[in-house]
């Protein structure tokens, strides 16, 4: 035993998947991955335990027996099926997410006598980025006051802060924007939506069109980079009991992704068109089951298993944006985390190329001929 055992919660999601890969690849960590379904990517040396975090009895049985856990990377979130965006301000949905954390942590902290740290992955909704009629500050900074509204991020932060008072262990909260990763079936993987759309267009013999109009300019967060942040927080003194924005380090115009994807998949880049990506993708979805069989893909034929609720956020690639709004919703300062000692970064264009390659390597989309 290394003496360091991390519980990665929400292991089948974007950040959880990346965290499992990172920690399981290191010799000094024992890794337990927790999620209702197994991660799509190989687990390596990690052990997967299927748990429903809303089942308090199951959680008491499972986590009450984990006295050797020293660290937690909490990446889990429960989204409202069928109307994910509406759920972001729903008190019932907030209550579910608070219950999930409590169901896990209460029994675990009672038995984990060498517990050292918990990280929680939140996001820019901590600043009200999902409340569309607000005037947004630019950039979002960790010092901004809370927005009076129903937000489980606040409940979870207050909970771990109260639990930690007077204890030797510590907590860290991360706030990324628009996460990119290689999880399949995740609820927030807009990059998978774009990749599948491009693959369908290529299979149909069609070019990848480019959106017209103004493009949102936003921060992006690579799930692999967030996993590095989770690793950093396990040991960094300046990460203790604090919150940090975490981003790639540049800003990105969403429409610029289309030529990058076309080049990555060796397909024709079309002209600029007035279109919406989700309706156009749905017109071609009848091709998908045949593509899975034709190319021997590991990706599921079932659309719910493939996308989760990601189609709801995937429309952002072509969403009409008023020119005055292009920088309103997704720009955050990363000065605080840099000054605290975390300096990892990645060019977002390179990140997109990486995931287009990785989707092929994992058998999510057809390989480039």
In which residue ranges do the predicted regions lie?
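A conserved pocket-lining segment of Rossmann-fold NAD(P)-dependent short-chain dehydrogenase/reductase
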Residues: 196-221, 245
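NAD(P)H-binding glycine-rich loop region in Rossmannoid oxidoreductase-like domains
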Residues: 39-103
């Amino acid at each position: 035993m290394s003496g360091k055992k991390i519980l990665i919660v929400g292991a089948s999601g974007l950040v959880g998947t990346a965290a499992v890969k990172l920690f399981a690849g290191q010799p000094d960590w024992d890794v337990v991955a927790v999620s209702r379904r197994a991660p799509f990517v190989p687990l390596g040396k990690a052990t997967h335990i299927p748990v429903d975090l809303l089942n308090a009895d199951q959680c008491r049985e499972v986590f009450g027996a984990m006295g050797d856990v020293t660290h937690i990377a909490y990446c889990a979130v429960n989204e409202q099926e069928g109307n994910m965006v509406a759920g972001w301000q729903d008190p019932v949905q907030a209550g579910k997410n608070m219950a999930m954390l409590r169901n896990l942590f209460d029994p675990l902290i009672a038995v984990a006598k060498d517990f050292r740290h918990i990280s929680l992955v939140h996001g820019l909704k901590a600043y009200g980025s999902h409340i569309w009629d607000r005037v947004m500050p630019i950039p979002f900074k960790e010092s901004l006051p809370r927005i009076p509204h129903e937000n489980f991020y606040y409940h979870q932060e207050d909970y771990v802060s109260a639990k930690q008072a007077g204890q030797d262990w510590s907590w860290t909260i991360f706030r990324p924007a628009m996460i990119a990763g290689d999880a399949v079936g995740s609820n927030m993987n807009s990059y998978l939506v774009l990749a599948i759309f491009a693959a369908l267009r290529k299979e149909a013999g069609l070019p990848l069109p480019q959106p017209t109009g103004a493009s949102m300019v936003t921060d992006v967060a690579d799930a692999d980079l967030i996993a590095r942040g989770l690793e950093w927080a396990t040991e960094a003194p300046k990460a203790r009991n604090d919150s940090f924005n975490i981003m790639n380090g540049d800003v990105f115009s969403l429409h610029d992704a289309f030529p990058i994807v076309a080049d990555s998949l060796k397909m024709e880049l079309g002209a600029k068109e007035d279109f919406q990506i989700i309706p156009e993708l749905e017109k071609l979805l009848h091709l998908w089951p045949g593509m899975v069989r034709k190319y021997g893909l590991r990706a599921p034929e079932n659309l719910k298993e493939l996308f989760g609720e990601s189609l709801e956020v995937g429309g952002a690639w072509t969403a009409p944006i008023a020119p005055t709004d292009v920088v309103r919703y997704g720009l955050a300062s990363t000065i605080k985390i840099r000054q605290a000692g975390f300096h990892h970064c990645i060019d977002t264009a390179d990140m997109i190329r990486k995931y287009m390659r990785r989707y092929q390597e994992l058998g999510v989309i057809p390989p480039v001929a």
